[in-house]
Amino acid sequence: TDSEILHCVKYHHGKYLAGADLKENDLCYITCFADNIAAFADRREADLQEAGFDKRIPLDSVFNILNGNQGNSHYAMQRLNPAMGINYPTEEPVEMEEHFYRTVVQDITDNLRGISLEEEYVNSLLTVLEANLTYIPSSTSRKELSDISLYDHVKITAAVASCVEQYLEERNQNNYREKLFENAVSTYEEPIFLLYSMDISGIQKFIYSVAEAGALKGLRARSFYLEIMMEHIIDELLEQVSLSRANLIYSGGGHCYLLLPNTDEVKRITEAYEADINEWLRQNFDIELYIACGYAVATPNTLRNEPRGSYEEMYLTVSENLSGKKAHRYQA
């Protein structure tokens, strides 16, 4: 409802939620909890700390501190627009101006008027937000690095919130205030998430087994086919588990990562879905293509690498599960 959405916007920070007179199952408790997880996953303190906030701060390049670098590149004020080309980071002075923020707000407002608050429009909303928020920093604090976009922060918040809601629903835990606000620290230790991955094997052989005549066109066609097929597989799975593309972390090269809720229902659905996809691949491509699926259980603290090394261990666990599936493709 409109009131639920307004509550999620108004009270997504704990300082505003603390004194609010709200029902114990108000969805804003989930939003606040998810926003905190997204924040401690993407916000890190800068080496040179200054006090206060500065709304003129541009989005920095993630490569500034990669591998010990000390770069100073950032992005120009720009919405995603194919006509303007790629917005490469620059070391030239850049300040986020007020008129740019007004343009962004107006474009989002205009697009919201044409979007219904229904399931099929969720991904359309994500597209609108991506176009407008990709080059806006999620934090303008002088004490923090500003290399994570507001779009990525909002997307992660939505992904986490949808997982938390399903996780609590399966456990019949409806007192969100107690679980996610009053006892948030202990809930950070609960295995709420699944880092889920799918990986298609046989891609190289499939793409390059084309006749010499028209080889280039054939290579492009097969590569495009695999890309579209993978996106379709992702969308179908997300629909079956009642999630959106906000939960898609990465997709490319026949591989993807998704953030899913750690529920028995999701595990049942993903297991059946993997079997169905591989049966379809066998029927259409014999044993040429195969999809391996695996996951690792994660807590909110895992997403901020606490304890140290747990974030890397999560991805290693997923990789080991995929390797095991590929080594034992078919069972009698």
What is the predicted function of each stretch?
Residues T1-D2, L6, G14-A332:
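Regulatory and interdomain segments flanking nucleotide-handling catalytic cores
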